[in-house]
Amino acid sequence: MFKSVVYSVLAAALVNAGTIPLGELADVAKIGTQEDIFPFLGGAGPYFSFPGDYGISRDLPEGCEMKQLQMLARHGERYPTYSKGATIMKTWYKLSNYTRQFNGSLSFLNDDYEFFIRDDDDLEMETTFANSDNVLNPYTGEMDAKRHAREFLAQYGYMFENQTSFPIFAASSERVHDTAQYFIDGLGDQFNISLQTVSEAMSAGANTLSAGNACPGWDEDANDDILDKYDTTYLDDIAKRLNKENKGLNLTSKDANTLFAWCAYELNARGYSDVCDIFTEDELVRYSYGQDLVSFYQDGPGYDMIRSVGANLFNATLKLLKQSETQDLKVWLSFTHDTDILNYLTTAGIIDDKNNLTAEYVPFMGNTFHKSWYVPQGARVYTEKFQCSNDTYVRYVINDAVVPIETCSTGPGFSCEINDFYDYAEKRVAGTDFLKVCNVSSVSNVTELTFYWDWNTTHYNDTLLKQ
């Protein structure tokens, strides 16, 4: 399967790129050999399917009819942010100014290595065919979005038989907007699609896909007392190992931590990364759990205000579900950021909030939260509402896998009967108050999410932000 993808990419490259440098052709053997580490990169690396699929078919249960489909997706693979890029460049500066021969796992730097960030303008941006470091790279955000669109049509294309004109909603980050546009391109020209760019600025208040941006009450340091307990001596060990192999290098534990991000973003930009081979399997596990902890206690159920933040969008999706019989549109497609999806899944109860993650050790048996499983680059969450005979059901499909609601999954395909789902959802949002908890009034007077209902008259076209 993967070879066919590589060959198709190669064919496209030959048509569109003219002469491919021989060095890049030599690298094709490395592409696709590192996919086993994607789940350990904290959602910074390329897309992969949810590993815990429980063996449940994602096909519509036999004899059922889809009534409404909602999608909430993350932007595709990207270059690092400005801040993360600056950190990676500092480590690269140390390495590039080392005057001796590299040894051990850094020896690849002796072979005319080219740093993957070739242009500062690429920071914050989607990786594309045009800005990728390797014309054979199958992991660009552009290709991911287009491939997702074709897979979407294969799975749900029948939903468009009587609906060829519809909106797609995107947060106003440039990379989110670009992902939505590549997805539109992948759907093909048989559709008349209106791309609605919805503000993610603080002033947008509740009328946004990115409620966290309008939440001045949110404090990323709120649970540092927990996070600081996590043992990060493995980073010291990495730095010591590399320094021992390369006398006078003087890498720090911060450099070691940065190398994990370097690995992930280079995969997005190049299709492979020799930096990824620096780490042992144990080190990847420890890094991955550290990323899980940070997300759980900053953007997930470990932070008590997140359920209220996610309720802003979750309540809107509930309203759409309840209006499915009266709404002309049957498919609702939205693109945003990973934190927004984590907030949403926290409110929905898909991420376990009964047991907080421990920072004392890596809980192999008890950990059900893996950040990268939920929000790899290009993540997608589908809410399916379907009817079987006279009964209606709801279920979630996350990154190609059906993920049942544990306490409500007795319906066909492990779905939740609609009235039971509404009861469940009511309990999930009980006590939440996005406007109050976030102190939204201090930054905006917008108190309601309306873009799903007024897009046709408002025509959202907000200024794109490079963030």
Swiss-Prot record:
Output the InterPro entries linked to this UniProt entry: Acid_Pase_AS, His_Pase_clade-2, His_PPase_superfam, Histidine_acid_Pase_euk
The answer to whether UniProt assigns keyword Glycoprotein to this entry is yes
Q: Which UniProt keywords apply?
A: Glycoprotein, Hydrolase, Signal
Reaction catalysed by this chain? a phosphate monoester + H2O = an alcohol + phosphate
List the catalytic residues. Answer: 75, 338
User: Which cellular component, as a GO term, is one annotated location?
Assistant: fungal-type cell wall
List the glycosylation sites. 97, 103, 162, 192, 250, 315, 356, 390, 439, 445, 456, 461
Q: Where is the signal peptide?
A: 1-17
Q: Name one GO biological process term.
A: thiamine-containing compound metabolic process
Q: What else is known?
A: Present with 952 molecules/cell in log phase SD medium.
Q: Which family does it belong to?
A: Belongs to the histidine acid phosphatase family.
Protein name, per record: Constitutive acid phosphatase
What is the organism of origin for this protein?
Answer: Saccharomyces cerevisiae (strain ATCC 204508 / S288c)
The gene name reads PHO3
